[in-house]
Swiss-Prot record:
Claim: Protein transport is one of the keywords in the record: yes
Job description of the protein: Required for cytoplasm to vacuole transport (Cvt), pexophagy and mitophagy. Also involved in endoplasmic reticulum-specific autophagic process and is essential for the survival of cells subjected to severe ER stress. Functions in protein retrieval from the endocytic pathway. Required for proper sorting of the v-SNARE protein SNC1.
Compartment list: Endosome membrane; Preautophagosomal structure membrane
Annotated protein name in UniProt: Autophagy-related protein 20
Key words, A-Z: Acetylation, Autophagy, Coiled coil, Endosome, Lipid-binding, Membrane, Phosphoprotein, Protein transport, Transport
Species of the source: Saccharomyces cerevisiae (strain ATCC 204508 / S288c) (Baker's yeast)
Gene3D superfamilies membership: Arfaptin homology (AH) domain/BAR domain, Phox-like domain
Domain annotation PX: ranges: 140-301
Length: 640
């Protein structure tokens, strides 16, 4: 009955659209160009041209690089309408270029689509996302060049990897693991979780300045059951996917409980996204590591890694490798110190006292704080409360199902009263129908909303790891500076002592040159006390014995000349290390701030926008279906 009402309502809406002749403007390039002109030219009237704006050569120099802001503001709400020009709720909302942006309710795009799927590769999604959130973390570079736009919209179109199945494989002696069958083009390969973990570890060492997508955290079924809400709950797998992942295509060939199933599907989703994002990274795809990982001929991935001279020669720490080419690490890179926790605290204090690298350090400190706040808002805010909401809907679904059964039993007992039994039957059917609708909603919220939000949290963590790498490189540079200054001070002190010794030697030589004879006779003791003379000799004997013991315990100090030579060698090595780390730090800071973080911001904007569109559509469809169910009950009650 509800399906028939949906069809009638859709037909009514279509007829109204034809009568009025007014159609909603599609998400085209015209709207995007208008917004682009505003963002480039500042406050002013947009140029309403249907053609894409071209970015001039000098435009990039005119736009100053802004800091990254990760605050989730009211403008992120797709239902928020443009407020009056004079409102100032908070300082965070006062972002240049936001007043000229007209937000649109995404429900209006799918007003006549109650059960159809939200297009996964809708081009208008990317176009809409580019013009939204212009003041959040995606505004690092001030504007988006035309050459960068297709890479964002084509990111999900180029996804070609699917995990077809997950099966339990026995290792013998009662041990087993879950193997994932990966389909890439026309071939399939089987990999386990530790293989993905090894691949990501290698990628981090091969591309230390690149944002490597996350993989699901390594944890047991027991720990994962504690980390998710309602671990014993079973969620209906939706027929449509989210992003480039369609979990309905993946089959679990194993006898698993609800917690195991959710963990496996959680891993399937994140591992699929991990591989698909790697395929869209031009820098990584220039190498053969991804094709090697997906090659069925490399049956055992760990054996392949151990047999590769390239992988085995990589430095264990990314702080001791050449960031531009880790496979060509120099001797100086291999000797660089690795900052520890104590050195970080000490150097942070000294850097604050001396105010070293004020602008660059302050810039990245603010960026790190913004990303940390953004990650916290996602994890402990949106993701947390969406999990709680999903659990509440799941419990409500069970309550609706139970109360529907109660009304059905009551109607059976009141069968002799025809009118009352009929009303009770209608109520029973209404609650049962609402329970079914809630079950569909809960499954979509869990798999298509909560799981993508969890992935966004992990992506924010990976971005902060990239910022942390730059911070550790900065601390490494400060350690070398501190050590170099200390060695130079020691050398100056040693040279000053040598000069003093030379002056003393000159004085002695001058005194000896005046007299050719040296008086070796012992001076007369006029004290007249023989006991004191004997005691003095005994005391001198003890002093000699003590000095012999002291020399046997302590190492003999090197002569000043040798110490001076060693210090000069150390200073030369530290100077070379300082030059290398300063060049590395400059390159790392430039790549992370101007390339990796803006790219992450654009992708994050597209992902969050798609999540919000899915969320609003799911809630709207459930509300519409539930309303029709209770309208039907009311019609029967009115006729009774």
């Amino acid at each position: 009955m509800s399906d028939l009402n949906d069809v009638q309502e859709n037909a009514k809406l279509n007829s109204e659209t034809r009568n009025t002749g007014k159609a909603e403007p599609p998400h085209g390039t015209t709207e995007y160009v208008a917004e682009a002109e505003i963002s480039k030219n500042g406050v002013g009237s947009p140029k309403k041209s249907p053609k894409k704006g071209k970015v001039g050569k000098g435009d990039n120099n005119k736009v100053e690089t802004e800091l990254v802001h990760t605050a989730l503001l009211e403008k992120d709400n797709p239902f928020m309408e443009e407020g009056p020009t004079g409102f100032t709720k908070s300082a965070l909302l006062e972002i240049p270029g936001m007043r000229s942006h007209n937000l649109k309710n995404p429900n209006e795009d799918y007003e006549d689509d109650s059960e159809g799927l939200l297009p996964l590769n809708q081009e208008s999604n990317a176009e809409t996302c580019r013009t939204s959130l212009s003041g959040s973390i995606n505004s690092m570079n001030g504007e988006t060049s035309a050459s960068e736009e297709p890479s964002v919209s084509n990111r999900k179109k180029s996804a070609r990897i699917h995990i077809l199945e997950a099966k339990r494989v026995s290792e013998g002696q009662g041990r087993a693991y879950i193997a994932y069958v990966i389909q890439f083009e026309n071939s399939t390969v089987q990999r386990r979780y530790s293989d993905f973990e090894s691949l990501r570890s290698i990628l981090i060492r091969l591309f230390p300045m690149t944002l490597i997508p996350p993989i699901p955290e390594k944890q047991s079924i027991k720990n994962y059951g504690k980390s998710i809400t309602g671990s014993s709950s079973k969620y209906l797998l939706p027929s449509e996917g989210s992003g480039s992942v369609d979990l309905s295509l993946s089959v679990i060939h194993a006898s698993v409980n609800n917690s195991d199933e959710k963990l496996i599907r959680h891993r399937i989703r994140m591992l699929t996204e991990f591989l698909n994002k790697l395929l869209t990274n031009e820098e990584i795809t220039k190498t053969s590591i991804i094709t090697d990982f997906l090659d069925p001929n490399n049956h055992n991935w760990h054996e392949f890694v151990n047999s590769s001279s390239t992988f085995s020669s990589l430095p264990k720490s990314i702080l001791q490798c050449n960031p531009l080419d880790p496979t060509n690490t120099t001797r100086i890179h291999a000797m660089l110190p690795i900052p520890g926790s104590s050195s970080q605290l000490l150097l942070n204090k000294e850097s604050n006292d001396k105010k070293m690298d004020k602008e660059r350090s302050k810039s990245f400190t603010n960026i790190e704080q913004d990303y940390k706040q953004y990650e916290n808002l996602l994890d402990n805010g949106i993701y947390k409360y969406n999990r709680r909401t999903t659990k509440t809907y799941h419990d409500l679904k069970s309550d609706y199902n139970e109360i529907g059964e109660v009304f059905a039993q009551f109607a059976h007992e009141q069968a002799q009263v025809g009118e009352l039994a009929e009303q009770l039957s209608y109520l029973s059917n209404a609650f049962s129908g609402s329970s079914i609708s809630l079950e569909k909603l809960v499954g979509r919220l869990y798999y298509n909303i909560n799981e993508p939000l969890n992935e966004s949290v992990h992506m924010a963590t990976s971005a902060r790891e990239l910022i942390k790498y730059r911070k550790l490189k900065y601390l490494q540079n400060e350690m070398i500076k501190k050590s170099l200054n200390s060695k130079r001070a020691q050398l100056e002190k040693l040279e000053a002592q040598n000069n003093e010794y030379k002056d003393v030697d000159k004085i002695i030589d001058n005194e000896m040159s005046k007299s050719h004879t040296i008086n070796l006779e012992r001076p007369n003791n006029n004290t007249g006390s023989g006991g004191k003379s004997y005691g003095g000799k005994l005391f001198n004997g003890f002093n000699k014995l003590a000095s012999m013991v002291k020399d046997s315990v302590k190492y003999q100090e090197t002569d000043p000349h040798t110490a001076s030579i060693n210090l000069k060698k150390e200073i030369e090595q530290l100077s070379e290390s300082l030059e290398v780390t300063e060049n590395d730090l400059e390159v790392i800071s430039k790549v992370i701030k101007n390339d990796q973080l803006p790219k992450f911001s654009k992708e994050r904007e597209v992902d969050l926008s798609e999540i919000l569109k899915h969320y609003s559509r799911y809630m709207r469809n459930y509300a519409r279906q539930n309303l029709e169910i209770w309208k039907e009950v009311k019609r029967h009650q009115d006729f009774a």
